[in-house]
Swiss-Prot record:
NCBIfam families: PRK00124.1. Signal peptide: none annotated. HAMAP family: UPF0178. It comes from Staphylococcus haemolyticus (strain JCSC1435). Belongs to the UPF0178 family. This is UPF0178 protein SH2212.
Amino acid sequence: MTRVIIDGDACPVVDSVIELTTGTGIFVTILRSFSHYSNKVLPNHVETIYIDDGPDAVDYKIVKLATPEDIVITQDYGLASLLLSKVKIVMHHKGHLYRSSNIDMLLQQRYNNAQIRKQGGRHKGPPPFSKEDKKQFERAFKSVIKQL
């Protein structure tokens, strides 16, 4: 059975995923650190798992829980690289799919930016998440779940 696992601490498309999976038989598991705790009532097909705060604690739990039938949504390139051979699909919250053909470039870019910061330099970060980004994600996610 397909499940969507969301790296939920900073994911701007949680509500979209919940809405688009309602009535499909697809379950959603949101993993968050306790510092992002919420009392929000969620539909029955959605489970939230809270993880102790700590560097990469949520990422490690996602790797541990993920199965070959899962779809994982994350903006973390390192986590995505660990999951590519483990799950069905790894998606970014802007809608693009992580693949073995693009992950090395993304990781190299992340490394280069870290080196610039380490030397006291600055680099341009990503633009703020927009309504168009949300629409693009929803189109891509609909396409993914349609193919299941």
